[in-house]
Amino acid sequence: NLDDMRQFAELHDIELTVIDNDTRLPSFKDALRWNEVYYGSKR
């Protein structure tokens, strides 16, 4: 389930993106951009 996937992603320090009925494209794109900055800086 989604909670397990979130825990897995957190444990392995990987990005998890969730697209569901509540997803709005502009905010989703913003989140992807910010995640790219965050995860890119951890390399």
UniProtKB/Swiss-Prot annotation:
<dbReference type="InterPro" id="IPR004216">
    <property type="entry name" value="Fuc/Ara_isomerase_C"/>
</dbReference>
<protein>
    <recommendedName>
        <fullName>L-arabinose isomerase</fullName>
        <ecNumber>5.3.1.4</ecNumber>
    </recommendedName>
</protein>
<dbReference type="GO" id="GO:0019569">
    <property type="term" value="P:L-arabinose catabolic process to xylulose 5-phosphate"/>
</dbReference>
<comment type="similarity">
    <text>Belongs to the arabinose isomerase family.</text>
</comment>
<keyword id="KW-0054">Arabinose catabolism</keyword>
<dbReference type="GO" id="GO:0008733">
    <property type="term" value="F:L-arabinose isomerase activity"/>
</dbReference>
<dbReference type="InterPro" id="IPR003762">
    <property type="entry name" value="Lara_isomerase"/>
</dbReference>
<comment type="pathway">
    <text>Carbohydrate degradation; L-arabinose degradation via L-ribulose; D-xylulose 5-phosphate from L-arabinose (bacterial route): step 1/3.</text>
</comment>
<keyword id="KW-0119">Carbohydrate metabolism</keyword>
<keyword id="KW-0413">Isomerase</keyword>
<comment type="subunit">
    <text>Homohexamer.</text>
</comment>
<comment type="function">
    <text>Catalyzes the conversion of L-arabinose to L-ribulose.</text>
</comment>
<dbReference type="GO" id="GO:0005829">
    <property type="term" value="C:cytosol"/>
</dbReference>
